[in-house]
Each structure stands twice: as structure tokens, then as C-alpha cells.
């Protein structure tokens, strides 16, 4: 009897309940002894102050789950004794959990409920539910009173801590706290956390602490609403719209949530594929970093060619990858391929190469395929899927290969995998009764035979077994996702699947008009699952509200409804859309594709790669976006060819009297865009049926050359006009025409000059037209050997024309200063050049960067000064050509 009583009292007594626990340290009332719980669940006396600090630190950052000495297996639950409130204890067999906040051990509540017991939030013990107080929270009045006093003390301590905090820290914490109720992407974690807080215990730590440990501090900034507006989150939006998000399992690995952070930094150098010339690898620099995306810039070229990619993109590689894999790297503008060296270039630029560890595509497992370089296949143009042409595999990297259209330039090549729906085995078109576009210039067009073509080209067809069938994408209409805005790639918007086909989806931006919808491949890296922006720290553009659709944005200043003044139709990040003409969302730009001169056409550096005849096929950025355009040109080809022959006869007759009577400008009879299509928009049928029509087309272009708007000038000889307007490839075929000076102005007769004197009012109108033409790109292709917009910019500096660089190199510092002051808008900058003792020779060696950064001159005047230097050099070159 005595033994049973003693055992019962020993079982009822819990040493943890008689101690005061705080930060993992237990204090025994009435003594100075301090205890801690070791890794085996046993109590240990703390003898050193440093040991106590380490215990507190470990408790603040760790969630302990260790068994105690009382957690021995005992009798079944039905035979377990129920203790009175004064002797509440831990149920046997239940593991102990130590709170991060208090360090007090407690047991899991779920298991106790299954046993019919109640948990006391103060002493962290269990007992009969019939004897509990305050709705089952406390076992006695003492515990309830003690818990109330503790809460009041915590509130006072919290207020004092907030007052002592750094104001900067407090400002940072306010938006973070406001996001806890809004970021419902982590709803399950938040529900668990709130439930644990109600129980007086924090099992996983606060959400902010977890994010800080993961390094996702940018996630806390995402989704902050503008002033006066409500916050936006996916969970409430899906509930309001009664919509369903696209399941994450439908996205490919490169579209779904990344495993690592984006480690790229602004200024890092790397190698990558040019998206407009996918057969070409270029030197790139990280211009911007936003979430898991990076904006890449072509070294030496305008920022209008910058483009966005994900940090795990397959088309970017570390420095030295091309040399290692045997690929040709195109150096920056102004560098020769044989002289370019990465080490010296990085040293010159004082830049850092992106670490190899940042490139996810370096660890790809290569799966063997049946494709080999040189094999033939039938491939569709991605911009016009109905056009299927003869193609060749020209390169292979990992699990992808490069498709090149035979006898077409490389600007239409693209990378794909073996399961791409755009490629087919040899004979697929014949089997499915589809039209196969043969290579331009191929002799046997009417009776094309694959067997004969393979024999002539000494090549093999890609085996049919190498082509894999792509499974259905699974996307359904009205599902929600996040998608990149192709008209303004800086933004990722809330989107809906508006329509689907076999391998594509139609993306609709919520709140916007359906005129902005566009088709995109289901495996495109520009679409992501719901919550991708929040997880990666990328800003997500919420749907437009009805108020934003009724009134223009007050902050952006753009008249287009919904536009906030960010972005530009011509990709210029630094020009605000203050007018509808520049807004990418305005009605006048909806039907336009972003038409830029080819990045390589204005390259003045020595050619490092063969120039490709871009006139053999239409520009995909202009008119190849729809199959109807190509079919229309193909149907009307015969009629156009006959007209060209007639124009050729007329042109030869008019060329004889070109000095006597100028012909009217083509702008009166044909718009510039139509001229561009005549020159570039030849479908494959055109190129293959009438190779002789190119000469007639060149003659027609010579007749239809647009004239300068300021003064009527006599028409030049056809040879000179062809040399000025023909593409670079056509100039190579006509060396006699290419030898003509391209910058020399036409010689006017004195009588014509007198007749061309405009009035003062006309002069003002012409000056405005010149300024507009210098700012906005024309449809006329630029002269290949001169920089972009050269003709437009040179019109703004008439006083510079005709001065060769050899004369400028002999100028003194005073003469350079006087010249700078003579330029419009540069009157105050002449003194700066004089103070820096810059003579003519040093002036010619200056770059635009030197003028802006070293001389501290604003961009506008710097452009005029730098353009004058270019004009001096061009005049010197023209003088040598004339000799």
C-alpha cells in the first residue's frame, strides 16, 4: 500500500510545472538555481552565464521536440488515470515540444484531444475536460490569473521595445506586417501559425523569420498597394471571381517555382543567344534584375534591343562557354573577332563575369536523341505555323537543336526539342497534303523530290523515330495564371486563359480589353503559375479596376486608359509615354509590331560573320505574324512580277532625262510601309519562281526613292540610289554600285537651288519635320555602314556637314571651344572643353560615354557633340572615296 502510494505521488509530481520557464531557462522558486533541458529531455543545472546565453539563443531560433523521462510507455488509454486540477500532468506516451517563446515544454494538443483530455495554456499540462476553466484554456483560477498578468506584461514590454526601435526599421516593418493578412499564397502555413499562436506556442516561427532565413526578403515588398487603394491577393481574387488557378503540375520545370534564388547582379557579363538571331551568340551584360528575371543588354548596341529572360533560361551561358563548346562568339560592336579576349575585355570594362554556379542549364542531363547536325526535316515558321519549309539541323546543345531554313538567312532560325509541334519528318507534308515551301532559288520547284534533294545536298533525313509526340498541355479556358506582357515585357500581369488549341493558349490580361490578347506556346517561359511572382519577389500587376478604365492614370500622365506611364512603344525605358503616339497600349500602336532596324545592319565594325541576305524572306517582325499575309503575297506574285517588268522599262527611259526633270516622290503614290513590304516581304514562292525579278525590283526602288522633305532635289542616277537603299547583301553583289559615295549629297543646278528657296513659314515647318524625323524611326532601312537614324540626326547639324576629320585634328583648344558653342543648345559647354584643354585630335577620340560621364554634359547636348564627331569622320571617309 505504501509502495503504491509513493509511486502514485511520484507519477503525479511534475518537476517542470514547479519551475518558472523563460527563454528555455527554468528557475526554481526560492533559489538561484537555473536549469535547462538537454538533448535527452533531462534537466541539467546551468553553472555558467555563457551557457545560459547560448540556451536562450538556441531557444529563440530552434523548435525542440525531445522526449522526457516521463514519456515512457504505459498502459492503454482506457486505463490511464485522470488527475484533479491540482495534479494535472502530461499524458504518458505524448512527445514533448518546447516553445520558442517561453521555453516551456508542452505536449501536442491533437493527441490529447483524442484521449479526452484538455490542455492548460499556462502550466502546459493536461487533465480532465470537465474540470477546466475559461472554455478549456486553464486548469485553475491561479493559472487563469497568472496568464492574464503575463499577457499584460508582454503588452507593456512590446510597447517599450517598439519605442526604442530605429525609425528606419519601424518603417520597414509596417508594410511587412500589413502583408500577413494579404499574402494568402501561403495560406496553409498561416493557418497553422495562427492556430499555434492561439494555443500559446509557436511551432514554426513567425512568417517573417522564415522568409528571412530563406532570403526571400523581396517577397515582403511584393504586392504593396498604391496609396489609398486596397491590397490585392490571389486567394481573395479567385474567390471573388469564382475562378480556378491553373494547376502547378501543368507547368514545365522552367515555368514553375524555381529552386534557387536569382544570384545575378547588375553589370555582370555573360554569353547568350540573340533572340532575333538565334544562331548567334553575343556578349551580354545584366542591365536590370527583377525577381527571378534579368534584363540583358548587347554590349556596344542601343538599349532598344535589350530583352528579358528568366534566371534559369537555357539561352544564357557563362563567360568562356562558346570557346569551350566550339561556338562562335560575336564580340561587342567595335571589336574584331580574332582580337577579342574575355580577360582583357573584363579588365577594360572593370566588370565581373557571372559565376558559373548561377547558370541552371549547366547541370542538364542530356537525353540521347536521333537528331544529328546536318539532317534534313520539314519545319514550320513559328510566327506563321501554316508555312512549312525545308529545313536543316545546324547545331545541337544539350537536349535542343537549332532549326535552319535552307537558303534563308539565319534570322529565322529557332531552337526546339524533339517533341516540338513545329517540326516534322521528311515527307510529312506530302502525307498530310500540305504545301511544302522549297528553298529559294532551287531549280526543281515544280517537281520537288526529297530523295533527289537529299542526294544533291549529300545529307540524311532525320529519322521518324526521333520525333516525339508532345502530350496535351491540359490548360482550360477561364483558368488563371501569371503572364508577361509582351507589349511591355517589364510587367507580369494577372491573366486568364481565353482560348486554347493543341499546343498554344490565348492569354487575356484581366481588366484589359481583349484587343491585347495574344497567343503563346503552352511551354513558353513567359507564363507562370499563380503565386510565382510572390515566391520570386517579382512585382505582379493587379487587374485594372473599373475606375482605372474610366479615367487616365494621374501619376503616369499617359492619356491611354490603364497605362501608368511606364514603358515605350520603341522599348525605350527612359522615355515616358506622355503621348498616345509612344504608348504601347494606345490604339494607333495596336496593329503595329515593334519595327526596329536590324541590330546588325547598322554595325560599322568590320564584319565578323557572313552577312545574310535579309531580302530573301519577309521580316517576321513586320508581316510574317499572320499566314494570311504570306498567302496574299504568294497569290499576287505573278501580277507584281509583270508590274515590275513594266516599271523596269519606264525607269530605264526616265534615267536618261533625270538631270532635266525630277520625278515625283513615291510618298505621293505609295506609303513608306508598302515600299518596305515590296523590298523585304517576298514569300518563299516569290523567291523561288522569279529570281530574275530582283533586278526589276531594284530598278523600281531606284525610281521610288523617297526624297528629303525640305527642298525638292533632282533625282539621282539609279546606280547611286540603289547603293543608298539596297541591303548590304545586294551591295555585295553589285560592287560597282557599292563604290559610289553613300553620303555625298546630290549636285543641284543653280536654277533649281533658286527655285527651292522656302519662305520663313515653310522653314519653320521643315525644321519641325526634321526634328520629328530625327526622333521617330522611319520605315526606310538605314544605310548599313552608318549608325542608326544617321540621316535624321545629321539634318539637325547642317553646319557640320562637309568638314573632314583631317581638318578638325589640327584645331586648337580655342577652335574646339568655338565649335562647341556654335552647336544649338551647347553654348555653355564650350568653356568646359577649353578648361579641359581638349584640342582637335583629342576631340576626335572622344566617345559618347566620355562626353556624358567625364565632361558631365547632359545627354541631349552630348548626342549633338558626338554626332558631329561622327560626321567629321564620315566626311573624311567620303573624301577618300571620291579620290
Curated annotation (Swiss-Prot):
This is Lethal(3)malignant brain tumor-like protein 3. Residues 811-875 form the SAM domain. Interacts with RNF2. Interacts (via SAM domain) with SAMD1 (via SAM domain); the interaction mediates L3MBTL3 binding to chromatin. Interacts with RBPJ; the interaction is required for L3MBTL3 localization to chromatin and is impaired the Notch-derived peptides containing the intracellular domain (NICD). Interacts (via SAM domain) with KDM1A. Interacts with DCAF5. Interacts with DNMT1. Interacts with E2F1. Interacts with SOX2. Interacts with SFMBT1. Residues 146-156, 616-662 have a biased composition (Basic and acidic residues). Residues 146-223, 595-768 are annotated as: Disordered. Residues 663-742, 749-768 have a biased composition (Low complexity). Keywords: Chromatin regulator, Isopeptide bond, Metal-binding, Nucleus, Repeat, Transcription, Transcription regulation, Ubl conjugation, Zinc, Zinc-finger. The lineage of its organism: Eukaryota, Metazoa, Chordata, Craniata, Vertebrata. SUPFAM superfamilies: SAM/Pointed domain (SSF47769), Tudor/PWWP/MBT (SSF63748). There is a cross-link at residue 638 (Glycyl lysine isopeptide (Lys-Gly) (interchain with G-Cter in SUMO2)). It comes from the Eukaryota.
Amino acid at each position: 500500500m505504501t509502495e503504491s502510494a509513493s509511486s502514485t505521488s511520484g507519477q503525479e509530481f511534475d518537476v517542470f510545472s514547479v519551475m518558472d520557464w523563460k527563454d528555455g531557462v527554468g528557475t526554481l522558486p526560492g533559489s538561484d538555481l537555473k536549469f535547462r533541458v538537454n538533448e535527452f529531455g533531462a534537466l541539467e543545472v546551468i553553472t555558467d552565464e555563457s551557457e545560459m546565453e547560448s540556451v536562450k539563443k538556441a531557444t529563440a531560433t530552434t523548435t525542440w521536440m525531445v522526449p522526457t523521462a516521463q514519456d515512457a510507455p504505459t498502459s492503454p488509454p482506457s486505463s490511464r488515470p485522470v488527475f484533479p486540477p491540482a495534479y494535472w500532468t502530461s499524458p504518458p506516451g505524448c512527445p514533448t515540444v518546447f516553445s520558442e517563446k517561453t521555453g516551456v515544454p508542452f505536449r501536442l494538443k491533437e493527441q490529447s484531444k483524442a484521449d479526452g483530455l484538455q490542455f492548460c495554456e499556462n502550466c502546459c499540462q493536461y487533465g480532465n475536460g470537465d474540470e477546466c476553466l475559461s472554455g478549456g484554456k486553464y486548469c485553475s483560477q491561479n493559472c487563469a490569473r497568472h496568464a492574464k498578468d503575463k499577457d499584460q506584461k508582454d503588452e507593456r514590454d512590446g510597447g517599450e521595445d517598439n519605442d526604442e526601435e530605429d525609425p528606419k526599421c519601424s518603417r520597414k516593418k509596417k508594410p511587412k506586417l500589413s502583408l500577413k493578412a494579404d499574402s494568402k499564397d501561403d495560406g496553409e502555413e498561416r493557418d497553422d501559425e495562427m492556430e499555434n499562436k492561439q494555443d500559446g506556442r509557436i511551432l514554426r516561427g513567425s512568417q517573417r523569420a522564415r522568409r528571412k532565413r530563406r532570403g526571400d526578403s523581396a517577397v515582403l515588398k511584393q504586392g504593396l498597394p498604391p496609396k489609398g487603394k486596397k491590397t490585392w491577393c490571389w486567394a481573395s481574387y479567385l474567390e471573388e471571381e469564382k475562378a480556378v488557378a491553373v494547376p502547378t503540375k501543368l507547368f514545365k520545370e522552367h515555368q514553375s517555382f524555381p529552386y534557387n534564388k536569382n544570384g545575378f547582379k547588375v553589370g555582370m557579363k555573360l554569353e547568350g543567344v540573340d533572340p532575333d538571331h538565334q544562331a548567334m551568340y553575343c556578349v551580354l551584360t545584366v542591365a536590370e534584375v527583377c525577381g527571378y528575371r534579368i534584363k540583358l543588354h548587347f554590349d556596344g548596341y542601343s538599349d532598344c534591343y535589350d530583352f528579358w529572360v528568366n534566371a534559369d533560361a537555357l539561352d544564357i551561358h557563362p563567360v568562356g562557354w562558346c570557346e569551350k563548346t566550339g561556338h562562335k562568339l560575336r564580340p561587342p560592336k567595335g571589336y574584331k573577332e580574332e582580337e577579342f579576349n574575355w580577360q582583357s575585355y573584363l579588365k577594360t570594362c572593370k566588370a565581373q563575369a557571372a559565376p558559373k554556379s548561377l547558370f541552371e542549364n549547366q547541370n542538364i542531363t542530356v537525353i540521347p536523341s536521333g537528331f544529328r547536325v546536318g539532317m534534313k526535316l520539314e519545319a514550320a515558321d513559328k510566327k506563321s505555323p501554316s508555312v512549312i519549309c525545308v529545313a536543316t539541323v545546324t547545331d545541337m546543345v544539350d537536349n535542343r537543336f537549332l532549326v535552319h531554313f535552307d537558303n534563308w538567312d539565319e534570322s529565322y532560325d529557332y531552337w526546339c526539342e524533339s517533341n516540338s509541334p513545329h517540326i516534322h519528318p521528311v515527307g510529312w507534308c506530302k502525307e498530310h497534303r500540305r504545301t511544302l515551301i522549297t528553298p529559294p532559288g532551287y531549280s526543281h520547284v515544280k517537281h520537288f523530290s526529297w530523295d533527289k534533294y537529299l542526294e544533291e545536298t549529300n545529307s540524311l533525313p532525320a529519322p521518324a523515330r526521333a520525333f516525339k509526340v508532345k502530350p496535351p498541355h491540359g490548360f482550360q479556358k477561364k483558368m488563371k495564371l501569371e503572364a508577361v506582357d509582351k507589349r511591355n515585357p517589364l510587367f507580369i500581369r494577372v491573366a486568364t486563359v481565353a482560348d486554347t488549341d493543341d499546343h498554344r493558349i490565348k492569354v487575356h490580361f484581366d481588366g484589359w480589353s481583349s484587343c491585347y490578347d495574344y497567343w503563346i506556346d503552352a511551354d513558353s517561359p513567359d507564363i507562370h503559375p499563380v503565386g510565382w511572382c510572390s515566391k520570386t519577389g517579382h512585382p505582379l500587376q493587379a487587374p485594372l479596376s473599373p475606375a482605372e478604365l474610366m479615367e487616365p492614370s494621374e501619376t503616369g500622365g499617359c492619356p491611354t486608359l490603364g497605362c501608368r506611364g511606364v514603358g515605350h512603344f520603341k522599348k525605350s525605358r527612359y522615355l515616358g509615354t506622355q503621348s498616345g503616339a509612344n504608348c504601347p497600349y494606345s490604339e494607333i500602336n495596336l496593329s503595329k509590331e515593334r519595327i526596329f532596324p536590324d541590330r546588325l545592319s547598322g554595325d560599322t565594325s568590320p564584319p565578323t560573320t557572313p552577312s545574310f541576305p535579309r531580302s530573301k524572306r519577309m521580316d517576321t517582325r513586320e508581316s510574317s505574324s499572320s499566314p494570311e499575309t504570306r498567302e496574299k503575297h504568294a497569290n499576287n506574285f505573278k501580277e507584281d512580277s509583270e508590274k515590275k517588268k513594266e516599271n523596269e522599262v519606264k525607269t530605264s527611259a526616265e534615267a536618261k532625262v533625270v538631270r532635266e526633270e525630277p520625278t515625283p516622290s513615291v510618298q505621293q503614290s505609295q506609303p513608306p510601309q508598302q515600299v518596305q513590304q515590296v523590298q523585304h516581304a517576298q514569300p518563299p514562292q516569290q523567291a523561288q519562281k522569279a529570281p530574275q525579278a530582283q533586278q526589276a525590283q531594284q530598278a523600281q526602288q531606284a525610281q521610288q526613292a523617297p526624297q528629303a522633305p525640305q527642298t525638292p532635289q533632282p533625282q539621282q542616277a539609279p546606280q547611286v540610289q540603289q547603293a543608298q537603299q539596297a541591303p548590304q547583301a545586294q551591295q555585295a553583289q553589285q560592287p560597282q554600285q557599292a563604290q559610289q559615295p553613300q553620303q555625298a549629297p546630290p549636285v543641284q543646278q543653280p536654277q533649281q537651288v533658286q527655285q527651292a528657296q522656302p519662305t520663313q513659314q515653310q522653314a519653320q515647318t521643315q525644321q519641325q519635320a526634321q526634328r520629328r524625323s530625327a526622333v521617330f524611326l522611319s520605315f526606310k532601312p538605314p544605310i548599313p555602314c552608318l549608325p542608326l537614324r544617321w540621316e535624321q540626326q545629321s539634318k539637325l547639324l547642317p553646319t557640320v556637314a562637309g568638314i573632314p576629320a583631317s581638318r578638325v585634328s589640327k584645331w586648337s583648344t580655342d577652335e574646339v571651344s568655338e565649335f562647341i558653342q556654335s552647336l544649338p543648345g551647347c553654348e555653355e559647354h564650350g568653356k568646359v572643353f577649353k578648361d579641359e584643354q581638349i584640342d582637335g585630335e583629342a576631340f576626335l577620340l572622344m566617345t559618347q560615354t566620355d562626353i556624358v560621364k567625364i565632361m558631365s554634359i547632359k545627354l541631349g547636348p552630348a548626342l549633338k557633340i558626338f554626332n558631329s564627331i561622327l560626321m567629321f569622320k564620315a566626311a573624311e571617309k567620303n573624301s577618300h572615296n571620291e579620290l
